[in-house]
Regions:
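C-terminal, non-catalytic macromolecule-binding modules
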Residues: 99-151
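Long, charge-rich alpha-helical interaction segments
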Residues: 1-59
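Conserved AWS/pre-SET-to-SET junction and N-terminal core of the SET lysine methyltransferase domain
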Residues: 54-82
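Conserved metal-binding segment of the jelly-roll/cupin
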Residues: 79-98
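Short, conserved beta-strand element in jelly-roll/cupin
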Residues: 62, 79, 107, 164-165, ...
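A broad, low-specificity signal marking well-ordered, structured residues that form hydrophobic/aromatic
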Residues: 86, 102, 159-162
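A short glycine-rich, His/Asp/Glu-containing loop-to-beta-strand
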Residues: 75, 139-170
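Long, charged amphipathic helices and adjacent flexible linkers at domain junctions
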Residues: 41-60, 126, 131-144
Length: 170
């Protein structure tokens, strides 16, 4: 199966179309072979990206055979510490593996899933609306308008998050 790799965007769109097409040969067994290959690289110490291969291994346990595992393999892994933020532009596939976070997004009734869920995945809609671009993460540093408040301003004007920490008993 050849991907049109004339551009990254075209290649990623072709891959997503191939993965999520209901007639695709990307069967659960093929996904399991992919997971096994990542685990083998980890075990041999030959992984070019241990963090990504470990993610694939964990997702393979949680969501066996799910084509979303291959999508996760292609994503930029980002770790956030408490008090850190990242901005994801609209129409970009994103996910979190673990931890607690706040997601601020535009009012919408069209959450489209790319896998790793027991919920419905509308693959045709996913491929149609997703902007397949290889983008670096955009970290958002907080401003400190007061001693007790951090304010996160996203590159999109309509998004702002303020976190105020009160002293105990206040």
């Amino acid at each position: 199966y050849r991907l049109k790799l004339s551009t990254v965007r075209g290649g990623l769109r072709s891959l997503a179309t191939w993965l999520f097409d209901e007639d695709s040969p990307a069967t659960p067994e093929l996904v399991e072979e992919f997971v096994a290959a990542c685990r083998s690289r980890l075990a041999s110490g030959m992984s070019p990206s241990p963090r990504t291969d470990e993610l694939v291994s964990v997702l393979g346990e949680k969501h066996p055979g799910d084509p979303g595992i291959i999508v996760a393999f292609l994503m930029n892994p980002v770790s956030l510490r408490p008090g850190e933020a990242v901005y994801i532009p609209p129409r970009q596939i994103h996910a979190y593996q673990s931890g607690l976070g706040i997601e601020v997004m535009a009012s919408s009734d069209n959450v489209v899933r790319a896998g790793l869920t027991g919920k419905y995945v509308d693959s045709a809609q996913l491929v149609e609306i997703t902007e397949f671009s290889a983008l670096p993460p955009v970290r958002v540093a907080p401003e400190h308008p007061s001693a007790t408040t951090d304010r996160f301003l996203a590159p999109a004007q309509e998004f702002e998050l303020s976190v105020t920490t009160l002293a105990p008993g206040k």
